[in-house]
Design a protein with these regions (language model features):
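Aromatic- and Gly/Pro-enriched helix-to-coil junctions and flexible linker segments
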Residues: 22-128
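N-terminal export/targeting leaders of redox proteins
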Residues: 1-29, 126-128
């Protein structure tokens, strides 16, 4: 009798657990969530023609299109894979000396901002 009760309870609660899990997954928008971070933290150095980061790497962060184009070294975003995405490696401090330079800047990204960038890349880095 207890097994039947537990199975019934589990079947009843399973849809609730699925709804809660889906509701807690935050959808990240480039325009609403990511772009304001880029404008606040990155665009001064990564905008043509004179931004220091732009002149050194060719990485232009003025638009989604130029971000996705990448730098002279190649793409900086691997949609769906923040672990292999060079941008994430930099802002998360996983890129050696260059990451340390970013951390010393006057206005480094907060942990929450880094999380937003990570989630956006993991969700496919869409222009939405």
């Amino acid at each position: 009798m207890n097994a039947v009760y537990l199975i019934s309870l589990l079947i009843t609660l399973l849809p609730c657990l699925v709804v809660v899990a889906c509701a807690t997954k935050q959808h990240i928008s480039y325009q609403r969530d990511v772009r304001p971070i880029v404008v606040d933290k990155c665009i001064d150095c990564h905008s043509p023609p004179y931004g220091e980061g732009y002149t050194k790497t060719g990485l232009d962060l003025v638009s989604y299109k130029s971000l996705m184009k990448g730098s002279v070294y190649g793409p900086v975003i691997v949609p769906g894979n923040s672990k292999k995405s060079p941008l994430n490696m930099l802002v998360e401090g996983r890129a050696g000396d260059l990451a340390r330079v970013l951390k010393r800047q006057h206005n480094p990204m907060t942990d929450d901002e880094i999380k937003v960038i990570r989630l956006w890349v993991e969700q496919g880095a869409q222009n939405n």
